[in-house]
Regions:
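Interdomain hinge/lid region at the active-site interface
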Residues: 118, 124-150
Length: 231
């Protein structure tokens, strides 16, 4: 079993340090897997995404595909809203292949959109085209078509959700927004409840500004999704 992930795997059970920096560590789950690739094991954090890590592993396994896949980490970074030095380096690598940041962001959103409908079906051919690793001649048209539908679905969901946000501005300056996505969002369609909360949060941030302390809670009968700014 091989695990490639960028989420926190829990506290380090053991760690190896060099010059005051963590260069290796283990966590509880390592007992149950053969290989665990995770930035937290070497003192990193979630800004170095699983998509970037998986691409690097693929390149190590098969160096011949380096140029074919070198734009994928940038897509993963933009899809996860990652920000770190490596992200800018990956964006530069993607630019060498002619991919702008705007187009890479569209690809990330189209991947998210198509993945929702594919779920557990085999969509390798479609995803290869979306990611521009195969059927390159069809890539632009597919992105244009999917992105238009993506924007349409998001707009429809936000029109239902935004009027039903419960807003509170606390004395300490925090803007707290809460919405019952089970009640006030369209069900069984894209975007799903978790994503809907993210889009609602982004709309509030766009209105108030990223420098404001904003917390958004989307909830249902048995779940909750929280988004927040860094302010």
């Amino acid at each position: 079993v091989v695990v490639i992930d960028h989420h926190s795997p829990g506290d380090l059970i053991t760690k190896e340090e060099k010059d005051g920096e963590i260069v290796g560590g283990t966590v509880a789950v390592d007992e149950y897997v053969d290989t665990h690739v995770n930035p937290y094991l070497v003192g990193g954090d979630s800004q170095l995404t699983a998509g970037a890590l998986a691409t690097e592993v693929a390149h190590i396994i098969n160096p011949e595909i380096k140029d074919l896949i070198k734009h994928l980490p940038a897509i993963a970074a933009l899809g996860d809203h990652a920000e770190c030095g490596e992200v800018y380096q990956y964006l530069e690598l993607a630019a060498e292949k002619g991919f702008t940041k705007e187009h890479l962001a569209k690809i990330a959103e189209c991947v998210d959109f198509e993945a929702y409908f594919l779920r557990f079906m085999n969509g390798r051919g479609i995803m290869d085209t979306i990611l521009a690793v195969d059927n390159i001649d069809k890539h632009e048209k597919m992105i244009d078509a999917l992105y238009k539908e993506y924007l349409k679905r998001v707009d429809t969901q936000l029109k239902a959700a935004i009027p039903n946000i419960e807003k509170t501005h606390f004395e300490n300056g925090i803007y707290f927004n809460m919405i019952d996505v089970e009640k006030y969002a369209h069900k069984f369609t894209f975007p799903a409840p978790g994503k809907t909360c993210g889009f609602v949060h982004d709309s509030v941030v766009q209105a108030l500004g990223e420098d404001k302390p904003i917390i958004t809670l989307g909830h249902g009968p048995d779940f909750g999704v929280i988004r927040a700014t860094d302010a």
